[in-house]
From Swiss-Prot:
Residues 89-142 form the bHLH domain. GO terms for molecular function: aryl hydrocarbon receptor binding; cis-regulatory region sequence-specific DNA binding; DNA-binding transcription factor activity; DNA-binding transcription factor activity, RNA polymerase II-specific; protein heterodimerization activity; protein homodimerization activity; protein-containing complex binding; RNA polymerase II cis-regulatory region sequence-specific DNA binding. Residues 424-467 form the PAC domain. Required for activity of the AHR. Upon ligand binding, AHR translocates into the nucleus, where it heterodimerizes with ARNT and induces transcription by binding to xenobiotic response elements (XRE). Not required for the ligand-binding subunit to translocate from the cytosol to the nucleus after ligand binding. The complex initiates transcription of genes involved in the regulation of a variety of biological processes, including angiogenesis, hematopoiesis, drug and lipid metabolism, cell motility and immune modulation. It comes from Rattus norvegicus. Residues 503-518, 691-709 have a biased composition (Low complexity). There is a cross-link at residue 58 (Glycyl lysine isopeptide (Lys-Gly) (interchain with G-Cter in SUMO2)). Residues 1-33, 73-95, 465-487, 499-520, 536-566, 644-676, 690-726, 739-800 are annotated as: Disordered. Keywords: Acetylation, Activator, DNA-binding, Isopeptide bond, Nucleus, Phosphoprotein, Repeat, Transcription, Transcription regulation, Ubl conjugation. This is Aryl hydrocarbon receptor nuclear translocator.
Length: 800
């Protein structure tokens, strides 16, 4: 009832079965409502075509339906099983294919790894990515950067093959050689093997490289040339990186193209003659390379250490065929080593080999502002013999020659002015064995960059050998050697013994000249004797100047010894008195005329009497000529003088006209250094009488200027001479400078003194003395008053 209620459609569709099912007589195949529905639905199609009875057809349909379901189930399971098998087989096939592909890739990458030297040389097997990266790098290195041509010509277009070869070999200081890897036969060697190994090319051609190396190095050389398997090969040391490569023989690496070789061996050195030009440095390297090889024994071959670097290349090259008579022809493609051999400089040179070359000749020192050693290089022991501690704390001037001490001081002063520039000076240095060594010192100053103050002197002291044959180095422009005078330069260039002998000769000549002058002066009664006055009585010694720079003519206002004269002059010649150190000048020498020729002597020609224009016996004072305006003023002064006076007047300090405007000049002169005796006219020692134009000059010693203490007594004032002889010269003495006050008998105190009174405030073009005053130093007996000089106000003031 429930089934009928649940399936109303079924009951209405099948009315014949409805009551049976409803009455509780279900069929054997009916177990529930759901199954009945399904079977009823499936049976509907069968009922439409069944002509038999309803009951029999019902049981038959149930059996047929069950059998069909079983068949479908079994067929479905067979299909599923076959598809699973197919999938499994497909997966197996794919895995096998992938396995084979991976195996092939691994094999190819392994082969590529063996072909790349950088990969095969690694201690561990690299991964595939590393192998590919190294292979690409290796191919790039073989092919180059791309800037070179593909045919292998890597030389510039403007260089030939020979020029390129010579440039490479010259830069490498070695020789190029090519040897066969199989036999070791020398295929090629460059001609530079001669200066390197003293062997001609003929000794290498036709021989093997094994014949040229040391017997103990043959095995190592054979190992470097080998390209086959060798079970005895041990670890490989990379000389470039210093790392130990993996053990075993890498045949692929050793046979591959571009494999690098670098090894050190001992090669035989010949005895053939070599061009000295090419041996100058290589022979020195050969001597150094013998270190550690022991001394060369008589009769044994001479070996040197050679460093060979190169690459393994295919032989013969591509496109090159060997001749038929070549012993290696027909053997197929072989390999050869193309390398450059260079002399290996050892790290520990032998002292005996380098004793003659490394002998130090200079040392470096540092000094403070006073010149005291603050640092000394250890090479001073071999240069001057002193230990560094013996020089520290001492002044360098203490070790300098007395004649060169001032020169060294001046050089230090000039270095301070140069502010960092180098100045060289040469002086004599006292070594520890008490010998004088010529030392060239190149010094410069180190200044504090913040305060700009000089801190220390840094000097490089070089021992100059055979200094007597070498010219003195020219000092820089900062030291004006012309101001030092020829005497100082002459003394610095002469040895001590030569200088002493020269002074002795000059002293003897001084005594002879003094005796001759004293005898002739005693014989001169008056003015007439001056007509026979010869220049031979006061001959001047020729002075050989030290350099060409001293031969230039002196300017009009330039004295040979000026006020700021170098003080070393008095140190070298202490015998020169104060008056003899005065400044000298000549008014009769033009600006373009040379004072005297180098090394020339003055001929003893007698002087004409008209050269002596002075009214007294005192020779005229040679004075620098001023401008023409000053001469005209003095000429006007002389015209107002008394023309009837027969002799030169003698002035007293009370009646002498004083020029107050010239007092600053006197004050300036008094402040000068007493070392050179400027304005010191009281002493009787003076230069000998010379009034010849161009004659006055400086002498290297005191011989040319003898001391005559008794000359004043031989020249009494000539008061009886007539006025006709010297009418225009009698009153010109009124212009005497106020510096000469107190020197009334002036002609008795000095004769022929040649003065230069330089004033620092007055320019050099305006000297202080004039040409018209040549003869104003006569007998100054008469007195004058100021009324006799109405034009005195025209005299230009010198207050400035």
């Amino acid at each position: 009832m429930a089934a009928t209620t649940a399936n109303p459609e079924m009951t209405s569709d099948v009315p014949s079965l409805g009551p049976t099912i409803a009455s509780g007589n279900p069929g054997p195949g009916i177990q529930g409502g759901g199954a009945v529905v399904q079977r009823a639905i499936k049976r509907r199609s069968g009922l439409d075509f069944d002509d038999e009875g309803e009951v029999n057809s019902k049981f038959l349909r149930c059996d047929d339906e069950q059998m069909c379901n079983d068949k479908e189930r079994f067929a479905r399971s067979d299909d599923e099983q076959s598809s699973a098998d197919k999938e499994r087989l497909a997966r197996e096939n794919h895995s096998e294919i992938e396995r084979r592909r991976r195996n092939k890739m691994t094999a190819y990458i392994t082969e590529l790894s063996d072909m790349v030297p950088t990969c095969s040389a690694l201690a561990r097997k690299p991964d595939k990515l590393t192998i590919l990266r190294m292979a690409v790098s290796h191919m790039k290195s073989l092919r180059g950067t791309g800037n070179t041509s593909t045919d292998g010509s890597y030389k510039p277009s403007f260089l030939t093959d020979q020029e390129l070869k010579h440039l490479i070999l010259e830069a490498a200081d070695g020789f190029l050689f090519i040897v066969s890897c199989e036999t070791g036969r020398v295929v090629y060697v460059s001609d530079s093997v001669t200066p390197v190994l003293n062997q001609p090319q003929s000794e290498w051609f036709g021989s093997t490289l094994y014949d040229q190396v040391h017997p103990d190095d043959v095995d190592k050389l054979r190992e470097q040339l080998s390209t086959s398997e060798n079970a005895l090969t041990g670890r490989i040391l990379d000389l470039k990186t210093g790392t130990v490569k993996k053990e075993g023989q890498q045949s692929s690496m050793r046979m591959c193209m571009g494999s690098r070789r670098s090894f050190i061996c001992r090669m035989r050195c010949g005895t053939s003659s070599v061009d000295p030009v090419s041996m100058n440095r290589l022979s020195f390297l050969r001597n150094r390379c013998r270190n550690g090889l022991g001394s060369v024994k008589e009769g044994e071959p001479h070996f040197v250490v050679v460093h060979c670097t190169g690459y393994i290349k295919a032989w013969p090259p591509a496109g090159v065929s060997l001749p038929d008579d070549d012993p290696e022809a027909g053997q197929g493609s072989k390999f050869c080593l193309v390398a450059i051999g260079r002399l290996q400089v050892t790290s520990s040179p032998n002292c005996t080999d380098m004793s003659n070359i490394c002998q130090p000749t200079e040392f470096i020192s540092r000094h403070n502002i006073e010149g005291i050693f603050t640092f000394v290089d250890h090479r001073c022991v071999a240069t001057v013999g002193y230990q560094p501690q013996e020089l520290l704390g001492k002044n360098i001037v203490e070790f300098c020659h007395p004649e060169d001490q001032q020169l060294l001081r001046d050089s230090f002063q000039q270095v301070v002015k140069l502010k960092g520039q180098v100045l060289s000076v040469m002086f004599r240095f006292r070594a520890k064995n008490r010998e004088w060594l010529w030392m060239r010192t190149s010094s410069f100053t180190f200044q504090n960059p913040y305060s700009d103050e000089m801190s220390i002197f840094i000097c490089t002291n070089t021992n100059v050998k055979n200094s007597s044959q070498e010219p003195r180095p020219t000092l820089s422009n900062t030291i004006q050697r012309s101001q030092l005078g020829p005497t100082t330069n002459l003394s610095l260039e002469m040895g001590t013994g030569v200088l002493a002998s020269r002074q002795q000769q000059q002293q003897q000549q001084q005594q002879q000249q003094q005796q001759q002058q004293q005898t002739e002066l005693d014989m001169v009664p008056g003015r007439d004797g001056l007509a026979s006055y010869s220049h031979s009585q006061v001959s001047v010694q020729p002075v050989a100047t030290a350099g060409s720079e001293h031969s230039k003519p002196l300017e009009k206002s330039e004295g040979l010894f000026v006020q700021d004269r170098d003080p070393r002059f008095s140190e070298i010649y202490p015998n020169i008195s104060a008056d003899q150190s005065k400044g000298l000048s000549s008014s009769t020498v033009p600006a373009t005329q040379q004072l005297f020729s180098q090394g020339s002597s003055f001929p003893p020609n007698p002087r004409p009497a008209e050269n002596f224009r002075n009214s007294g016996l005192t020779p005229p004072v040679t004075i620098v000529q001023p401008s023409s305006s000053a001469g005209q003023i003095l000429a006007q002064i002389s015209r107002h003088s008394n023309l009837t006076q027969g002799s030169a007047p003698t002035w007293t300090s009370s009646t002498r006209p004083g020029f107050s405007a010239q007092l600053p000049t006197q004050a300036t002169a008094k402040t000068r250094s007493s070392q050179f005796g400027v304005n010191n006219f009281q002493t009787s020692s003076s230069f000998s009488a010379m009034s010849l134009p161009g004659a006055p000059t400086a002498s290297p010693s005191t011989a040319a200027y003898p001391t005559l203490p008794n000359r004043g007594s031989n020249f009494p004032p000539e008061t009886g001479q007539t006025t006709g002889q010297f009418q225009t010269r009698t009153a010109e003495g009124v212009g005497v400078w106020p510096q000469w006050q107190g020197q009334q008998p002036h002609h008795r105190s000095s004769s022929n003194e040649q003065h230069v009174q330089p004033t620092s405030a007055q320019p050099s073009s305006q000297p202080e003395v004039f040409q018209e005053m040549l003869s104003m130093l006569g007998d100054q007996s008469n007195t004058y008053n100021n009324e006799e000089f109405p034009d005195l106000t025209m005299f230009p003031p010198f207050s400035e």
